[in-house]
Every structure is written in structure tokens, then in C-alpha cells.
């Protein structure tokens, strides 16, 4: 069921955000084994992934509620083809700053965030439905080198709700880029997880609320979206 074309007020901070249901989309960022699972890229790179199970659960709750409410859903999936052509050579800053690329150079034969591998795959609880577009992104931002903006504009989307990982890297970068492209951006903060100490999560929340968009909690967003859903509507399991 498509979202209804009516004015809504999202339960956000630092203030409620007015939007239109039919012009609002959920963007799920990088919910992949590499970022969320033991033995994945982030774990191998030395980051703490012990906090991922509740984040997966909360992101899945938002996803299911968005589906019931009829919102457009887009999944962003980070990685590269086996040739690593999109990653760039030494002259690219990505070559120097990408942790998975650095790990693979130090461990020949390893395959992190390579399309078709377990590391690149989206976790079971957040699997896209057949009609939900997947944006394959080669950089931190879901807008960089992808067709995301074109697709959102074509569908008349003006407001974006974000869940996913990592708060301070790919999610915040997407929120910033959305702001600079004149989208209203909302991060469901507790449905994201940072790469690094809790302080970087707090910094991202501060930055977004003060400069680039709005934040919400999973409980508030799910309750709101459930209110938009048609009576008796059920989420479609992946």
C-alpha cells in the first residue's frame, strides 16, 4: 500500500518535523555482515561489534513499520566489485583511508565488502524485498557515485529517514549529503551504531540535531509509522 498523500508531523528532535507521508522514504544504510557480524570487516579491523544485535532488532522494527505504512524503502550496500576498480588506486584518498582496503592489502586473499561474498551480504533481518531498490555505493555516502538522488527525485521524495551503520561514518555522511541536496533528513539514532567509542555517536547526534537534520528514537518512530499503516496491514517478511 502506498503512503497516503497527507501532511504528517514526525516525532523528531530538536523539534517535530512536518512532512508528507507520500514524500517520505526510509533509507537503510549498510546493514551488512561486514559491519554487524563477528568475523566481518569491522570486527577484523578492531572495532567493537558487540552492540550490533539490538541495533539490528531496532532497525528491523523501523523497516517493518515503514513497510506497513507504505513508505518507499531504499537499501544502501557498501562495497566493490572483485576487481576493486571502484575503490581506486594509490592516487585515491580512499586507498589510504578505507579500513577494509588496508586490511586486504595486509592480508592477501581476504575479501572484505566484495560483492558476492558473505561480508558484503545484507543480514537476514534486513533483507530487501524484491521491489525495494538496492543502491550499491563505493564510498561512505549513499549519494556518492550512485543513482540514489535521481531515484528519490523521480519518486517525489523530500524527506528521508535513516537507519543503519555506522552512525559517525556512512550514516552521518549520508545525512550531511542529503541536507546539501535539499532533503529533510532524520536519523533514528538508536537504530544506528557507531564505529568507535560512544563519544563519536554522541557527536554525530549533536551534529545532526544542530546542523544537518533531525533525530528520533526507534520507539517513537515505530509508534508513529504504525499510526500511518492501514488497519490490519501486515509487514511482508523478507
Feature map (PLM): residue ranges:
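A structural signal for short, well-ordered beta-strand segments and their strand-loop junctions
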Residues: 73-76, 187
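Short glycine-enriched, charge-decorated loop/helix-capping segments at active-site entrances
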Residues: 41-51
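A short, glycine/acidic-enriched catalytic loop
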Residues: 38
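N-terminal nucleotide-binding beta1-loop-alpha1 segment
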Residues: 29-30
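Short glycine-rich, polar/acidic loop-and-turn segments at beta strand-coil junctions
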Residues: 33, 59, 77-80
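Glycine-rich loop(s) and the adjacent beta-strand/alpha-helix scaffold that form part
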Residues: 56
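Catalytic-core segment of enzymes that process non-peptidic bonds
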Residues: 75-84, 90-91
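Active-site-adjacent betaalpha module
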Residues: 1-25, 34-35, 52, 61, ...
